[in-house]
UniProtKB/Swiss-Prot annotation:
Matching Pfam families: Ldh_1_C (PF02866), Ldh_1_N (PF00056)
Organism the protein comes from: Ligilactobacillus salivarius (strain UCC118) (Lactobacillus salivarius)
Subunit: Homotetramer.
Keyword Transferase listed: no
Modified residues annotated as Phosphotyrosine in this record: 224
Amino acids binding NAD(+): 18, 39, 44, 69, 83-84, 105, 122-124, 147
Keywords per UniProt: Allosteric enzyme, Cytoplasm, NAD, Oxidoreductase, Phosphoprotein
Regulation: Allosterically activated by fructose 1,6-bisphosphate (FBP).
Function: Catalyzes the conversion of lactate to pyruvate.
Official protein name in the record: L-lactate dehydrogenase
GO cellular component, one term: cytoplasm
Pathway in which the depicted protein is active: Fermentation; pyruvate fermentation to lactate; (S)-lactate from pyruvate: step 1/1
HAMAP family reported for this sequence: Lactate_dehydrog
Amino acid sequence: MSKTQNHQKVILVGDGAVGSSYAYAMALQGTAEEFGIVDVVKERTEGDALDLFDATGFTFPKKIYAAEYSDCKDADLVVITAGAPQKPGETRLDLVNKNLKILSSIVKPVVESGFDGIFLVAANPVDILTYATWKFSGFPKEKVIGSGTSLDTARLRVAMTEMTGIKDPRSMHAYIMGEHGDSEFAAYSAATIGGRPFLDWAKEHGVSKEDLDKMEDDVRNKAYEIINKKGATFYGVAAALARISKAILRDENAVLPVSAYMEGQYGLNDIFIGTPAVVNGTGLHEVIEVPLNEEESKKMTESAATLKKVLTDGLKALEENK
């Protein structure tokens, strides 16, 4: 970590709905003693900083302020939420060209500040933008993490509580994997409840494959439902970012579903994709390769192929438009 354990610093880049929700979650959580906010709309960051600072009167002491890229120099963590929002009817992959351009204008000044901490990326399409952050920054792969399927996994676990009647989502050990987007899938074959395979529980309780497919599909499409109703999703992903941030800042060695770089895991290479991984103060410590069945392995391969094509096309377009 770049600062002492007793004083940790986070810089947020992007003060939109996701960014401000994340800032609030961090204020409530009490991790990081210093929190700076960078955005092109400087007045908004100043207002949010003042508002959030008021909240510390009820939570934890914290220095919160409108920051500049130069403030990243001694930060432990830079969190990127800036980007064009996903509109109704638009997929996350549709955002790639717009947000690659925005991202390139962010990563350069962060790195030029002397920043030597960890990047956490949440802007969509997150797997592609995490890869691009790694490429643009020149950082070691371990120091670049995407929020990946963390929110999707939470949605699956919540859905499983409704199906099983077991009310605590933390009792559900199951993961959504692959792209954070339309090609993601539920790794049901590796899911457990209290150590028991979830598929055994489902069979015993008369849950059909159609029921499981519907739950997976509902999870996959939940973001679209929320976007159609209120214009954007932000509370869920903000909570996910706060959880990942805590694992980094508290050096937890926690297993979390994130977007991680592949070096042979699942037969994949040179791609960031959603998988459980060990997250700690050094960043992404280790990928946990989930044992997938044949159908799930095929889905993981297809999801990676989808991402790689869009990534290649997006980076090529960015280079041509320079």
